[in-house]
Amino acid sequence: MEDSQETSPSSNNSSEELSSALHLSKGMSIFLDILRRADKNDDGKLSFEEFKAYFADGVLSGEELHELFHTIDTHNTNNLDTEELCEYFSQHLGEYENVLAALEDLNLSILKAMGKTKKDYQEASNLEQFVTRFLLKETLNQLQSLQNSLECAMETTEEQTRQERQGPAKPEVLSIQWPGKRSSRRVQRHNSFSPNSPQFNVSGPGLLEEDNQWMTQINRLQKLIDRLEKKDLKLEPLEEEIIEGNTKSHIMLVQRQMSVIEEDLEEFQLALKHYVESASSQSGCLRISIQKLSNESRYMIYEFWENSSVWNSHLQTNYSKTFQRSNVDFLETPELTSTMLVPASWWILNNN
């Protein structure tokens, strides 16, 4: 299936050769696309870390993902190739075999129609241009309606599975150090952020703004984390903070690091904006702050939540999963996520 991300001629050729060699049945070309998108170091195969980054759904545990990986790895190489992916999933497609085949046809039909539109639209009459715009809009509406139905079904099945497991499973948290980054074609382009500020500001009620007070607090926390990572750290007694029993003593701070592919920067910014808008409207979300590192396509996202339960529930929401899925294409490497509990009194103090 097509993907907006560029691929090199050699990559396209190898995909075509592989598809021909495997004699893929109708609809199975999706697994060529899955391998290409999940293969972050472009070596033509999936390591367990790459497999986990792509397939983790917040329901299967790390152990279950590891077991699934080795079940698919019939060649016993500790890596997965397209043949192994196709061989495993083809045994479990059921009715989705027809769905994938239809998607393959639909993908080709839409690309053909858009190619025709690009070629003829400028010279068409006003009425013909109107019809083209109308058909594009209605096609999009139909696809969005189907997407909403699929997302509803996906949420229902995941919730049912969690209930059967007697409680929500803690999603697999990715914290992977990658030896190298996917080679991307770095191009100097206009940055839609303010050239005088490394901060990413999302305007609108309840959203982020550049806040020196909060950035100071965040920088303090970052320094604390850096200190805690040093082996020679010596802890000394500090002044005790006495907390009443009926007081919520801690809040959850989540730090997310994302390295964005330069060519996908604008699309990532739009997806991030939608994510922040949705997350900030949740009752358990106290605040979200975003930093963009200067001269890099790297973002630091800090999320403050009332507690870990609210955070885990947030991970299962539709908008959060949509953002996670889009990041598969937008990020050079899987995002790094870390969490820590901080005294709730900090929040109360800074908001009084």
From Swiss-Prot:
<dbReference type="InterPro" id="IPR002048">
    <property type="entry name" value="EF_hand_dom"/>
</dbReference>
<keyword id="KW-0106">Calcium</keyword>
<keyword id="KW-0963">Cytoplasm</keyword>
<keyword id="KW-0479">Metal-binding</keyword>
<feature type="domain" description="EF-hand 2">
    <location>
        <begin position="60"/>
        <end position="95"/>
    </location>
</feature>
<feature type="region of interest" description="Disordered">
    <location>
        <begin position="180"/>
        <end position="202"/>
    </location>
</feature>
<dbReference type="InterPro" id="IPR039862">
    <property type="entry name" value="NECAB1/2/3"/>
</dbReference>
<feature type="binding site">
    <location>
        <position position="43"/>
    </location>
    <ligand>
        <name>Ca(2+)</name>
    </ligand>
</feature>
<feature type="coiled-coil region">
    <location>
        <begin position="209"/>
        <end position="275"/>
    </location>
</feature>
<dbReference type="InterPro" id="IPR011992">
    <property type="entry name" value="EF-hand-dom_pair"/>
</dbReference>
<feature type="modified residue" description="Phosphoserine">
    <location>
        <position position="192"/>
    </location>
</feature>
<dbReference type="GO" id="GO:0005829">
    <property type="term" value="C:cytosol"/>
</dbReference>
<dbReference type="InterPro" id="IPR007138">
    <property type="entry name" value="ABM_dom"/>
</dbReference>
<dbReference type="GO" id="GO:0042984">
    <property type="term" value="P:regulation of amyloid precursor protein biosynthetic process"/>
</dbReference>
<protein>
    <recommendedName>
        <fullName>N-terminal EF-hand calcium-binding protein 1</fullName>
    </recommendedName>
</protein>
<feature type="binding site">
    <location>
        <position position="39"/>
    </location>
    <ligand>
        <name>Ca(2+)</name>
    </ligand>
</feature>
<feature type="domain" description="EF-hand 1">
    <location>
        <begin position="26"/>
        <end position="61"/>
    </location>
</feature>
<keyword id="KW-0175">Coiled coil</keyword>
<dbReference type="GO" id="GO:0005654">
    <property type="term" value="C:nucleoplasm"/>
</dbReference>
<feature type="binding site">
    <location>
        <position position="41"/>
    </location>
    <ligand>
        <name>Ca(2+)</name>
    </ligand>
</feature>
<dbReference type="GO" id="GO:0005509">
    <property type="term" value="F:calcium ion binding"/>
</dbReference>
<dbReference type="GO" id="GO:0005929">
    <property type="term" value="C:cilium"/>
</dbReference>
<dbReference type="GO" id="GO:0042802">
    <property type="term" value="F:identical protein binding"/>
</dbReference>
<keyword id="KW-0677">Repeat</keyword>
<dbReference type="Pfam" id="PF03992">
    <property type="entry name" value="ABM"/>
</dbReference>
<feature type="coiled-coil region">
    <location>
        <begin position="135"/>
        <end position="163"/>
    </location>
</feature>
<feature type="modified residue" description="Phosphoserine">
    <location>
        <position position="197"/>
    </location>
</feature>
<feature type="binding site">
    <location>
        <position position="50"/>
    </location>
    <ligand>
        <name>Ca(2+)</name>
    </ligand>
</feature>
<keyword id="KW-0597">Phosphoprotein</keyword>
<comment type="subunit">
    <text>Interacts with STX1. May interact with CPNE6.</text>
</comment>
<feature type="binding site">
    <location>
        <position position="45"/>
    </location>
    <ligand>
        <name>Ca(2+)</name>
    </ligand>
</feature>
<feature type="domain" description="ABM">
    <location>
        <begin position="252"/>
        <end position="340"/>
    </location>
</feature>
<feature type="compositionally biased region" description="Polar residues">
    <location>
        <begin position="190"/>
        <end position="202"/>
    </location>
</feature>
<feature type="modified residue" description="Phosphoserine">
    <location>
        <position position="4"/>
    </location>
</feature>
<dbReference type="InterPro" id="IPR011008">
    <property type="entry name" value="Dimeric_a/b-barrel"/>
</dbReference>
<dbReference type="GO" id="GO:0001835">
    <property type="term" value="P:blastocyst hatching"/>
</dbReference>
<dbReference type="InterPro" id="IPR018247">
    <property type="entry name" value="EF_Hand_1_Ca_BS"/>
</dbReference>
